[in-house]
Regions:
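N-terminal auxiliary segments of SAM/dcSAM-dependent transferases
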Residues: 1-29
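Conserved SAM-binding strand-loop segment of SAM-dependent methyltransferases
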Residues: 110-122
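Conserved class I S-adenosyl-L-methionine
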Residues: 67-76
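A short acidic, Gly/Pro-enriched loop at the edge of an enzyme's catalytic core
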Residues: 126-135
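A short glycine-rich, Lys/Arg-flanked "PGG" loop and its adjoining helix->strand segment in the class I
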Residues: 152-170
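Conserved SAM-binding loop of SAM-dependent methyltransferases across substrates and taxa
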Residues: 77-88
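Conserved SAM/SAH-binding beta-strand->alpha-helix loop
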Residues: 97-99
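A short SAM/SAH-binding and catalytic strip from SAM-dependent methyltransferases
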Residues: 134-151
Length: 175
């Protein structure tokens, strides 16, 4: 894993509070194979939500070949990052929170095809040179106005999303 903090503003602009410290400890101290046991023992919604392998099912319909480059915008604690790393050639994550990026990095520390960029998408996007086959915004798009500085942040995020994927765009929406 590469954890790139070049665009990190120096402080996390959002946090779920103390539970993130607990999640950081879990990602650091337990192997992914132990997460189900930890979830069962802790009986905590945030731990279930962020560490359950079930969330990876959201990717099951995508016809990966293993040669794709994927951009995961808003990767959070890495709930689907591991599944992307298993299915794609390269995965680049963008995450605003340093703590969540560290959680993601710890839990996927054995992945050699993972790069996590910490900072605001608008700042990082300026320096992206890769073209991506797939771009995910899982659980992120609805927060666009919180981190996209624009009169129309949802349109801006969509346009940036398209720019980053133009060379290899694949539409699997069924339309």
């Amino acid at each position: 894993v590469i954890l790139d903090t070049t665009c990190y503003p120096g402080k996390d602009l959002y946090s779920d509070g103390a539970i993130e410290d607990e999640m950081l400890a879990i990602s650091r101290d337990f192997a992914p194979e132990e997460f189900n046991r930890v979830i069962s023992e802790r009986k905590s919604w945030p731990i279930l939500y962020h560490f359950s392998h079930i969330r990876e099912n959201i990717l099951s319909w995508i016809p990966f070949t293993g040669e794709e480059k994927v951009l995961e915008i808003g990767s959070g604690c890495g709930a689907v990052t591991g599944a992307l790393c298993e299915r794609a050639k390269e995965v680049t994550c963008i995450e605003l929170s340093m703590k969540r990026s560290k959680i993601n990095a710890y839990r996927h520390q054995d992945q050699d095809n993972l790069k996590i960029l910490v900072g605001n998408f608008q700042e990082i996007e300026k320096n992206l040179t890769e073209k991506y086959d797939y771009i995910t915004l899982i659980g992120v798009f609805e927060y666009g106005e919180s981190y996209i500085r624009s009169e129309n942040p949802y349109v801006g995020l969509s346009q940036d999303h398209i720019k980053a994927s133009e060379a290899g765009w694949k539409d699997h929406s069924g339309h």
